[in-house]
Amino acid sequence: MSKGHSLQDPYLNTLRKEKVPVSIYLVNGIKLQGSIESFDQFVVLLKNTVSQMVYKHAISTVVPARPVRLPSPTDGEHGDSEPGNA
C-alpha cells in the first residue's frame, strides 16, 4: 500500500473495532450516520438500520461521536508523516 494509507487504515480500523458511532459527510454535503462495519481500499461499509456501501472518493469527512485514540506507531513509518502533511 502507498504511504497515504498509513494513517487512514489504522484510524478506520480503530473506529470499526471499537464500534464508534460516526458521521460521514460526503462531498455533495450529505451526512450519513452509523458505525463502520468494514472497509477496504475503495469503500466503507456503514451500518445503521441498514448497511450502506460508501465509496471513499465520495467521502469528505469522517467525524467520530467520541474522541478516538490511535495505536502508537511501532515500526516508525508514521513518525515523519505528521508535521508537514496538512
From Swiss-Prot:
This protein's record includes keyword RNA-binding: yes
A single GO cellular-component term on record: cytosol
Keywords for this protein: RNA-binding, Stress response
Comp. bias intervals (Basic and acidic residues): 75-86
Domain named Sm: residues: 9-68
Signal peptide: none
Family: Belongs to the Hfq family.
Entry protein name: RNA-binding protein Hfq
